[in-house]
């Protein structure tokens, strides 16, 4: 039986997107990548989620953890669509140790999930460098989740299978993340953020947009030099 090198199961996934100025974002990514726009804007997304399980070649690793990843949407030198990650924070020490292998810049910080008081069911928070960077309070709707229509804005955000990364001396890397189509459901949410400022990224030029998914399973392949792709 074929086994994926690394399988990550995620649950209770809250995608929080911000529109940003494309020219400003272009200066924040490697010069060999290009910003991809949707609805005439560039976008940065924070994904606040629970890692419910991790396995390598079928062997379970670690315990459930809370994580946040921050990414944007790019095209590579040959026009391939993909993702570029600015950073991540997690409660899982194994993930922290694997960060260089996955080209993820894990930062020191605190990420938490708790049952919320008041109007919303769940509260997720992120602290970076001693500052509250992000608070999301949300309640998923009662309607069942479904896959995003092709060529829609939600599909632009979630249906991505290629990840670009950079390394020492200007080296270029690419990896693949396989998954079934994401199922997204309705959600009511409020967002308080200073995240982009904390990470020295371009400030939002509009209101945040939130999507919710009950979860998915991701098959992660090792990164390789771009010239081997």
Locate the predicted segments by residue.
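Internal, well-folded beta-alpha domain core
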Residues: 14, 69-229
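A short, surface-exposed helix-loop junction/capping segment
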Residues: 1-10
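Glycine/small-residue-rich interface belts in oligomeric ring/scaffold proteins
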Residues: 6, 22-70
